[in-house]
Swiss-Prot record:
Compositional bias segments (type: Basic residues): 670-685
Residue runs in coiled coils: 248-442
Location of region: Contributes to fast Ca(2+)-dependent inactivation of CRAC channels: 475-483
Signal peptide: 1-22
Protein name, per record: Stromal interaction molecule 1
Species this protein is from: Mus musculus
Gene designation per UniProt: Stim1
Complexes and interactors: Monomer in the presence of Ca(2+). It oligomerizes in absence of Ca(2+). Forms homooligomers and heterooligomers with STIM2. Interacts with pore-forming subunits of CRAC channels, ORAI1, ORAI2 and ORAI3; this interaction is potentiated upon Ca(2+) store depletion. Interacts (via the transmembrane region and the SOAR/CAD domain) with SPPL3; the interaction promotes the binding of STIM1 to ORAI1. Interacts with ORAI1. Interacts with MAPRE1; probably required for targeting to the growing microtubule plus ends.
CDD domains: SAM_STIM1, SOAR
Sites where a glycan is attached: N131, N171
Tissue: Expressed in maturation-stage ameloblasts (at protein level). Expressed in all tissues examined and in many cell types, including bone marrow stroma, fibroblast, B-cell precursors, lymphoma and erythroleukemia.
Post-translation changes: Glycosylation is required for cell surface expression.
Length: 685
């Protein structure tokens, strides 16, 4: 306890001693400063009255002027009474700690490079801060100096803008005693802010605070809106580009498809040419076979004429007649099924010329579509190049190039679709025309040859046919694979199959008279129906009529004497299909007759042919349904009663003809017959 008391006494004594020394030192300073201060105050007052005489009697203004003078002294290092540019720059950098004092330097000097005390005072008086009210000073203290805790002190002292220079100088009495600022950092901060305000005017933050806030908000809104707009435009441009790329890919696929169709078209044309060559070879082969059949018929004719067996000749003639009838029946059916009308040769050339002219217009339309496709491709490539640049996406998004390219692509695609549809319709139409006319139209010698063949003025045709350039195609033509089939290529398999069938089918033998009558009635019905649709070619019908008009319908001796295979062969037309069927049947019938002649050599050479004819038509025939003609017995009696065989044969032949006519008119009275006209007897004019 004693130790603590002693320590407290020693501390108290030391404090009192230190306080006494400081008081004595301050008293001495006051005495010396009072004498020097009196002289400085007199000089300051005289200078202030010289500079601003109306305000020299105001104590507050004197204090403010003295503060401005002290600020000038701080800046004037060489003490020559003027502050030059270097001195002000050094003061701003060292005392005010401005790293880039360019703006402040220009504001302080303006156009005057030397600043005196008078210039500095006048600049202070013209400043906006000089006229600040108490509220404005307090606002400056809160917002700029950021010392709101001294607001009450400033309000009590009623400090206005006139007192600002006193705050800008180091004054312990003003800051410590009057303002009661105990914190040294607060005093230094207040001094620096006040010095900046006195020298350079009010701070910009205080003067334009709300405006800057508003501009900042507006800038933020504009920035956010711009970013959002850029994002929307970027997404829209990407979607548009994707759509355009899809259209472009579809256009490429259409081009490839059109190219494939063109290749298939060329391939089909090559097949057409091959089929045409095969057809020519087949016709040549059929003509050779016809010539062989003619030679064989001539040989059989000579053989039949040289035999002395009358009965075998009669039977041979009947078989020959049956085969000829069957061959003519088949030939007529073949005629009905394969030929109805033959167009003239000039029509083929005119149709070929029409096709070539249409191809010219089609090529022009196709070239226009290709040109539109090329323009669309170039536009797409330009957009791709623009997107690779820095602002390419924004430029593409704000310009109308995307819409233009999209429109060009759609236009090109529509043009390609029209070209494809025109190609499809043209192929189908000319295919049907070829089928109906029966000759080639698409494959032709060319427009120049056709113009020369038809004796047309070349100036009527205009420009020459453009060569088809690089052919393109749409997505819709893949269904045309089966449509590019030539009519001749479709007809040639049936032609070959029919020829093959005629070469391999078994030859018909001798049939019953009932079957022949039934077949005649059915073929006549079929012929009557088909004649209404397709008329028979005149040359083939005329040849068949001439061949059949030379024979009777029941095969009497008149056929043997007047009609023979050689004459029938000569009267038949040159059609390979019809003539081949006829001569194959004829050849087969003649072979059978020849074999029968060899099997029956016992018949006497002078035998009456009436016996053979009556035997072939008598009830003892192998077919029980064969009708017996009325004139058979008459022929037998006539042959027995007469001594001249030729007269008896002629008489029996006439009676047999009458009997056959009566049989055809009287048999089957309940059924209506439609006999073929080639089996009718020729009318005598």
């Amino acid at each position: 306890m004693d130790v603590c008391a002693r320590l407290a006494l020693w501390l108290l004594w030391g404090l009192l001693l230190h306080q006494g020394q400081s008081l004595s030192h301050s008293h001495s300073e006051k005495n010396t400063g009072a004498s020097s201060g009196a002289t400085s105050e007199e000089s300051t007052e005289a200078e202030f009255c010289r500079i601003d005489k109306p305000l020299c009697h105001s104590e507050d203004e004197k204090l403010s002027f003295e503060a401005v003078r002290n600020i000038h002294k701080l800046m004037d290092d060489d003490a020559n009474g003027d502050v030059d540019v270097e001195e002000s720059d050094e003061f701003l950098r060292e005392d005010l700690n401005y790293h880039d004092p360019t703006v402040k330097h220009s504001t302080f000097h303006g156009e005057d490079k030397l600043i005196s005390v008078e210039d500095l005072w006048k600049a202070w008086k013209s400043s906006e801060v000089y006229n600040w009210t108490v509220d404005e000073v307090i606002q400056w203290l809160i917002t700029y100096v950021e010392l709101p805790q001294y607001e009450e002190t400033f309000r009590k002292l009623q400090l206005t803008g006139h007192a600002m220079p006193r705050l800008a100088v180091t004054n312990t009495t003003m800051t410590g005693t009057v303002l009661k600022m105990t914190d040294r950092s607060h005093r230094q901060k207040l001094q620096l802010k006040a010095l900046d305000t006195v020298l350079f005017g009010p701070p910009l933050l205080t003067r334009h605070n709300h405006l800057k806030d508003f501009m900042l908000v507006v800038s933020i809104v504009i920035g956010v809106g711009g970013c959002w707009f850029a994002y929307i435009q970027n997404r829209y441009s990407k979607e548009h580009m994707k759509k355009m790329m899809k259209d472009l890919e579809g256009l490429h696929r259409a081009e490839q498809s059109l190219h494939d169709l063109q290749e298939r078209l060329h391939k089909a044309q090559e097949e057409h040419r091959t089929v045409e060559v095969e057809k020519v070879h087949l016709e040549k082969k059929l003509r050779d076979e016809i010539n062989l059949a003619k030679q064989e018929a001539q040989r059989l004719k000579e053989l039949r004429e040289g035999t002395e067996n009358e009965r075998s000749r009669q039977k041979y003639a009947e078989e020959e007649l049956e085969q000829v009838r069957e061959a003519l029946r088949k030939a007529e059916k073949e005629l009905e099924s394969h030929s109805s009308w033959y167009a003239p040769e000039a029509l083929q050339k005119w149709l070929q010329l029409t096709h070539e002219v249409e191809v010219q217009y089609y090529n022009i339309k196709k070239q226009n579509a290709e040109r539109q496709l090329l323009v669309a491709k170039e536009g797409a490539e330009k957009i791709k190049k623009k997107r690779n640049t820095l602002f390419g996406t924004f430029h593409v998004a704000h310009s109308s190039s995307l819409d233009d390219v999209d429109h060009k692509i759609l236009t090109a695609k529509q043009a390609l679709s029209e070209v494809t549809a025109a190609l499809r319709e043209r192929l189908h139409r000319w295919q049907q025309i070829e089928i109906l006319c029966g000759f080639q139209i698409v494959n032709n010698p060319g427009i120049h040859s056709l113009v020369a063949a038809l004796n047309i003025d070349p100036s009527w045709m205009g420009s020459t046919r453009p060569n088809p350039a690089h052919f393109i195609m749409t997505d819709d033509v893949d269904d045309m694979d089966e449509e590019i089939v030539s009519p001749l290529s479709m007809q040639s398999p049936s032609l070959q199959s029919s020829v093959r069938q005629r070469l391999t089918e078994p030859q018909l033998g001798l049939g019953s008279q009932r079957d022949l009558t039934h077949s005649d009635s059915e073929s006549s019905l079929h012929m009557s129906d088909r004649q209404r649709v397709a008329p028979k070619p005149p040359q083939m019908g005329r040849a068949a009529d001439e061949a059949l008009n030379a024979m009777p319908s029941n095969g009497s001796h008149r056929l043997i004497e007047g009609v023979h295979p050689g004459s029938l062969v000569e009267k038949l037309p040159d059609s390979p299909a019809l003539a081949k069927k006829t001569f194959m049947a004829l050849n087969h019938g003649l072979d059978k007759a020849h074999s029968l002649m060899e099997l029956n050599p016992s018949v006497p050479p002078g035998g009456s042919p009436l016996l053979d004819s009556s035997h072939s038509l008598s009830p003892s025939s192998p077919d029980p349904d064969t009708p017996s003609p009325v004139g058979d017995n008459r022929a037998l009696q006539g042959s027995r009663n007469t001594r001249i065989p030729h007269l008896a044969g002629k008489k029996a032949m006439a009676e047999e003809d009458n009997g056959s006519i009566g049989e055809e008119t009287d048999s089957s009275p309940g059924r209506k017959k439609f006999p073929l006209k080639i089996f009718k007897k020729p009318l005598k004019k």
